[in-house]
Amino acid sequence: MAREPQRIRRRERKNITAGVAHVNASFNNTMITITDAQGNAIAWSSAGMMGFKGSRKSTPYAAQVAAEDAGKKAAEHGVRTLEVEVKGPGSGRESALRALQAVGFHITSIRDVTPIPHNGVRPSKRRRV
């Protein structure tokens, strides 16, 4: 039985000039997703996708590399201006933002959308190292 040759799907070039960069900086990783105004993903990247493993994923440099990668992918689709939404307490927040500026995007606004509980669930026990 001969296998049929698989069709390679080429990524369609969307022509979007303005987008929203969602930077999710947790203690363990940094994820960057660039979407259009409606929230449809255009490009994404994370520190883990860039080859960083373990505790190196949470470094500012890993966030910078991931943001540059997501920015280059989004620039191929014609994105020039970005609104940035930053979420989470991680160390890659500012470095991801600077990397997006360095790629050449015009950043119109920066919003912190970190969810803050109004005394929600009980936190986990303290770490003893």
From Swiss-Prot:
Lineage, top-rank taxon, reads: Bacteria
Q: Which Pfam families match?
A: Ribosomal_S11 (PF00411)
Q: Could you list the residue ranges that cross the membrane?
A: none
Which biological process terms from the Gene Ontology are attached to this UniProt entry? translation
Which cellular component appears as one GO term in the record? Answer: ribonucleoprotein complex
- Name a GO molecular-function annotation: structural constituent of ribosome
Q: Which PANTHER family match?
A: 40S RIBOSOMAL PROTEIN S14/30S RIBOSOMAL PROTEIN S11 (PTHR11759)
Q: Which family does it belong to?
A: Belongs to the universal ribosomal protein uS11 family.
Sum up the protein's function in the record's words: Located on the platform of the 30S subunit, it bridges several disparate RNA helices of the 16S rRNA. Forms part of the Shine-Dalgarno cleft in the 70S ribosome.
The entry's protein name is Small ribosomal subunit protein uS11
Organism annotation: Rhizorhabdus wittichii (strain DSM 6014 / CCUG 31198 / JCM 15750 / NBRC 105917 / EY 4224 / RW1)
Q: Which gene encodes it?
A: rpsK
